């Protein structure tokens, strides 16, 4: 009998390869938990596709109909967002603007049924010198700034609330001010010049080169690992991209850059999970790294898409980010209590007023603490549990050689 995590990975594997699950039986409580887990990982439509003809699932008609109905709704909504995004990108083309697309539609197209792999937003990388032109074009298209004070940041978010279209414009792929992963930008010097043209649904799109995109997917997951975690869908994206674009990827360069950033064991673990759980061959460039995956796989499956399903785990990211930042800069790591009072820069994304009024940092600390103690929608809040999770996840980073 498979547990819920095993059922999810089995369903995802089938959906990725255009197959259907072959389950002999499943209890109603198991199916209910599986559906909820698929929501947390944003793969519910793929679960529905894989389980569509499964007699065992159909023995629970209420849950089966709920699954199919919700999957159809999400897939239709994603198809509309994709169409709206392509219309938006065509509008930019007409303006002579060619931003580089990362993730999003470029990952969706890897799957047998692209719009079953849902995306909340679309990410665009631009030349910082052209930001004013892009900003003007987005406003003209009818989009609004999510945060009017964020236009000077490395990323700026826009939303069309009528179309439910969410766009993130990046001046760099990673926050250069981050002590933990700001150095992840280095391999992408010249990425705009190396970008390539592709086509999707008749629209010409510009995206990262195959090698740059492969590396970016790995590093993006690494960033989320530090911030609380990343889910099985991101691992699927990475492995699918590596498999589909493998001949176009400079794997030697990927391995070299991973070693520079000390994430080669982490990358090897993801590819091993792809081979063991998702039936996608491990790239030869990482075949020599024999690595256990049990702890990383559990971390991925237990945290949802971005490790924020548990509020205590979400807050534990302060500890993991601090551990890597200290390791990278060679300074002494701050204690757990100090991590509860992060520097202004670390809180600016959440408390926009700090950008213009840095002296309000103590107020932000108080607001953050109050929110932490009163928030309940993702489960009971416990500072001690957050510290415990943080310490456990620091050991995970140590296991994969990310920190010493």
Model-derived features with residue positions:
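Conserved NTP-donor binding/palm subdomain of two-metal-ion nucleotidyltransferases/polymerases, i.e.
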Residues: 1-120, 126-404
């Amino acid at each position: 009998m498979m547990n819920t995590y095993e059922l999810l990975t089995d369903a995802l594997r089938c959906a990725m390869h255009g197959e259907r699950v072959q389950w002999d039986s499943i209890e109603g409580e198991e199916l209910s938990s599986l559906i909820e887990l698929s929501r947390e990982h944003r793969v519910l439509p793929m679960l529905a596709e894989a389980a569509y003809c499964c007699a065992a699932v159909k023995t629970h008609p209420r849950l089966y109909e709920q699954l199919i109905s919700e999957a159809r709704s999400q897939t239709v909504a994603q198809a509309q967002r994709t169409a709206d995004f392509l219309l938006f990108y065509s509008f930019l083309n007409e303006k002579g603007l060619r931003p580089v697309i990362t993730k999003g539609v470029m990952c969706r197209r890897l799957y047998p049924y692209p719009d079953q792999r849902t995306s909340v937003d679309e990410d665009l990388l631009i030349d910082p010198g052209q930001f004013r032109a892009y900003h003007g074009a987005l406003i003209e298209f009818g989009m609004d700034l999510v945060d009017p004070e964020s236009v000077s940041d490395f990323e700026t978010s826009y939303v069309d609330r009528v179309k439910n279209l969410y766009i993130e414009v990046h001046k760099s792929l990673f926050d250069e001010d981050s002590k933990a992963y700001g150095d992840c930008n280095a391999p992408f010097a010249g990425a705009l010049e190396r970008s390539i043209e592709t086509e999707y649904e008749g629209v010409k799109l510009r995206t990262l080169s195959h090698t740059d995109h492969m590396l970016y997917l790995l590093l993006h997951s690494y960033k989320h690992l530090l911030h609380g975690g990343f889910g099985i869908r991101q691992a699927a994206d990475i492995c699918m991209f590596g498999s589909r674009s493998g001949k176009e990827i400079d794997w030697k360069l990927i391995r070299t850059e991973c070693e520079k950033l000390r994430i080669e064991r982490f990358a090897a673990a993801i590819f091993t999970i792809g081979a063991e759980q998702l039936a996608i061959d491990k790239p030869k460039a990482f075949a020599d790294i024999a690595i256990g995956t049990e702890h990383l796989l559990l971390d991925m499956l237990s945290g949802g898409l971005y490790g924020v399903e548990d509020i205590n785990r979400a807050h534990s990211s302060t500890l993991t980010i601090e551990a890597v930042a200290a390791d990278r800069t060679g300074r002494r790591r701050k204690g757990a209590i100090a991590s509860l009072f992060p520097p202004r820069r670390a809180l600016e994304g959440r408390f926009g007023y700090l950008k213009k009024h840095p002296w309000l940092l103590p107020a932000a600390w108080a607001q953050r603490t109050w929110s932490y103690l009163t928030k309940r929608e993702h489960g009971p809040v416990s500072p001690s549990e957050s510290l415990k999770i943080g310490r456990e996840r620091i050991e995970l980073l140590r296991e994969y050689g990310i920190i010493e």
